[in-house]
Amino acid sequence: MSGMEWFPLLGLANRARKVVSGEDLVIKEIRNARAKLVLLTEDASSNTAKKVTDKCNYYKVPYKKVESRAVLGRSIGKEARVVVAVTDQGFANKLISLLD
């Protein structure tokens, strides 16, 4: 489980209702300046990846890539997810430090 220190923290953020999942909802959070960090899977489609990363770059929201959609979904207790946004600055800062 090396390199997966972020896994339980994202689950905790989800239980605290500080995580939004799904492409449309994440883009809405980015536009409304509520997203503090976006997690995107490496197996996301090129169209989805471009759309999300372009929004993050334009609105200056940091984003990180994680292994797969199954891992990301499992970390928040749901089915496979391609993109999630963290809406709390404290959780976002800790996740950034763990993912670097």
Curated annotation (Swiss-Prot):
User: Its Gene Ontology biological processes?
Assistant: ribosome biogenesis
Deletion phenotype = None; has no effect on viability, growth or sporulation at low, normal or elevated temperatures.
Which SUPFAM superfamilies does the record cross-reference, listed alphabetically?
L30e-like (SSF55315)
Give the GO molecular function terms. RNA binding
Q: Which residues form the signal peptide?
A: none
The cross-references to Pfam families, in alphabetical order and at most eight, read: Ribosomal_L7Ae
Query: Quick check: keyword RNA-binding in the entry?
Result: yes
Q: Which GO terms describe its cellular component?
A: ribonucleoprotein complex
Query: Which InterPro entries does the UniProt entry name for this protein?
Result: Ribosomal_eL30-like_sf, Ribosomal_eL8-like_CS, Ribosomal_eL8/eL30/eS12/Gad45
The UniProt keywords, alphabetically, are: RNA-binding
Say which family it is in: Belongs to the eukaryotic ribosomal protein eL8 family.
Function of the protein: RNA-binding protein that recognizes the K-turn motif present in ribosomal RNA, but also in box C/D and box C'/D' sRNAs.
- Protein name, per record: RNA-binding protein YlxQ
Organism per entry: Bacillus subtilis (strain 168)
